[in-house]
């Protein structure tokens, strides 16, 4: 009478465990990818809401904007003097959001802050919410173009009506 398992039986069990584990790894990677994408989408929405609320402060002559990094008076005065305040507005927004949101895809060699005022068109831009300023036009002080790449490739014209599936975009008028 034999006791124990043969080598072939043990190899079959190990092979079955390996196959089951591979399904688990694939599913786990899918869950991680979905969570990162959801976090990038949430970051984008939060930045758009924040910038929109700050833009509303100009008409109300609220004073301090973007956590005190700029004032509505500075923006209006610069615009009225035929200047372009949008670069300073962008810098104020990025500074105000510094440290509050992290890029779920990692630092990409740029840093862990999810909000930046530079970049676009490279794989390292994945997950970053980028704020691009546009100066005065059509009677407006300017526009903050806020866009986030949520999957590769991170290239293309994000301002296209209807947009690209992998790029979230919201323009905020000032």
At which residue positions do the language-model features occur?
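Generic cytosolic/nucleocytoplasmic N-terminal low-complexity/intrinsically disordered segments
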Residues: 1-2, 36, 42, 87, ...
């Amino acid at each position: 009478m034999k006791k124990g398992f043969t080598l072939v039986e043990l190899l079959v069990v190990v092979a079955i465990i390996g196959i089951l584990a591979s399904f688990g790894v694939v599913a786990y990677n899918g869950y991680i990818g979905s969570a990162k994408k959801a976090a990038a989408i949430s970051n984008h929405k939060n930045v758009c809401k924040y910038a929109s609320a700050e833009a509303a402060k100009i008409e109300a002559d609220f004073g301090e904007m973007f956590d005190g990094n700029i004032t509505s008076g500075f923006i209006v005065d610069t615009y009225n003097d035929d200047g372009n305040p949008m670069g300073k507005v962008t810098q104020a927004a990025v500074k105000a959001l510094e440290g509050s949101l992290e890029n779920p895809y990692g630092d990409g060699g740029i840093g862990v802050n999810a909000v930046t005022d530079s970049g676009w068109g490279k794989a390292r831009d994945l997950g970053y919410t980028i704020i691009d300023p546009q100066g005065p036009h059509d009677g407006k002080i300017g526009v903050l173009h806020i866009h986030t790449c949520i999957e590769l490739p991170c290239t293309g014209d994000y301002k296209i009506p209807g947009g690209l599936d992998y790029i979230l975009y919201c323009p905020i008028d000032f």
